[in-house]
Each structure stands twice: as C-alpha cells, then as structure tokens.
C-alpha cells in the first residue's frame, strides 16, 4: 500500500486492474484502517478517474454475492450527504404499493443520518441473504431489500472507516454501480 499511496501523492492515477486489485485487497483485510482511510482521502482531494472507478466497480462485482432477481428493477442511488429525508427508500414503498416490483439495495448511513438500512431496520425489516425469502417478499409485497454488507464484502470491510470519516467518498458512487442484482 505504501507504494500505491506514494504514486497517488505524486498525482498519478491508478489503472483499472490496479484499482481492482486494491479493492480486492481491502476486502481481504490486507491493509490496515489507516492505510485505507489514506487511500479514500486521496480521492476526496482529487476526482476519481473513470479507469479507477471502473476498476473498483469490477472488484465489487467480482466479489459480490449474486442475487437472481433480475426480472425486477434494482434501485440504489446513494446518499446526498445533506442529512435530508431518505426519499429513495420512501419512493420504493410508493412504487411497490402501486404494484410495481422493486429491489432496493442500500446500507447504513455513512454520511447522513439515515441510510436505507437505518430506515428499513427501524421498520422491523430483518436483513437476509436468503433469495427464497426475498422472492416471497416480492410476491407478497412487491419489494425486497438487499443490505449491502451481506452482498458486497468490500463494503462491509470499509463501513467503519467510512462512518469514521463521515464524508461522501467514492463508495457513495460505487454502491449504486455495484448492485448485486444487475439489470
């Protein structure tokens, strides 16, 4: 990680494969929290390149726990960082209530007071990775919820670091791009 950080400190960019490997290593616990926080901070100080974002996304998709609910529309838009009302979760219930099946993918709020998982948990939703249970939920209620850490190990690995930083990071862009249910 030291060489990677020096490269980034010199205003160089990561290649797609390099970014992919880095996120895989983060998920596998090969870097400590300080190193990961340093890496995240670099991308707070400069824009992430398309190659870097694609590499990180590739890693998330390769490591995800796939869910075959592909006949339904996945929704995940990421937080706005403004501590506003969690509109996307409310919209999912509105859409489901109108008879349109929805798969919501989300997490606890890292940069706001209420992520989708916070809202769902407060309403008694028990998070699961059991696809059969999700299918039953779709059949009965037109909605299924995918708690991101159950389906993306890398997101689980960085959750405490993101919570500690308490600012929007490139993971806010990655989550919606790496929904376990691909359209």
Give residue spans per PLM region.
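Conserved active-site and cofactor/substrate-binding residues in soluble primary-metabolism enzymes
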Residues: 13-21, 30-38, 48-55, 86, ...
């Amino acid at each position: 990680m030291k060489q990677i950080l020096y490269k980034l400190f010199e205003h160089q960019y990561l290649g797609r494969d390099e970014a992919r490997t880095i996120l895989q290593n983060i998920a596998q616990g090969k870097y400590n929290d300080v190193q990961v926080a340093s890496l995240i901070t670099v991308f707070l100080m400069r824009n992430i390149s398309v190659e870097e974002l694609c590499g990180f996304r590739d890693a998330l998709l390769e490591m995800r726990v796939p869910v075959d609910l592909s006949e339904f529309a996945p929704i995940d838009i990421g937080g706005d960082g403004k501590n506003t009302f969690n509109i996307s979760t409310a919209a999912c219930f509105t859409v489901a209530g109108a008879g349109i099946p929805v798969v919501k993918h989300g997490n606890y709020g890292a940069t706001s007071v209420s992520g989708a998982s916070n809202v769902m948990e407060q309403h008694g939703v028990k998070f699961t990775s059991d696809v059969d249970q999700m299918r039953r939920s779709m059949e009965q209620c037109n909605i299924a919820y995918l708690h991101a850490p159950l389906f993306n190990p890398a997101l689980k690995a960085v959750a405490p670091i993101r919570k500690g930083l308490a600012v929007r990071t490139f993971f806010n862009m990655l989550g919606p791009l790496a929904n376990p249910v691909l359209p």
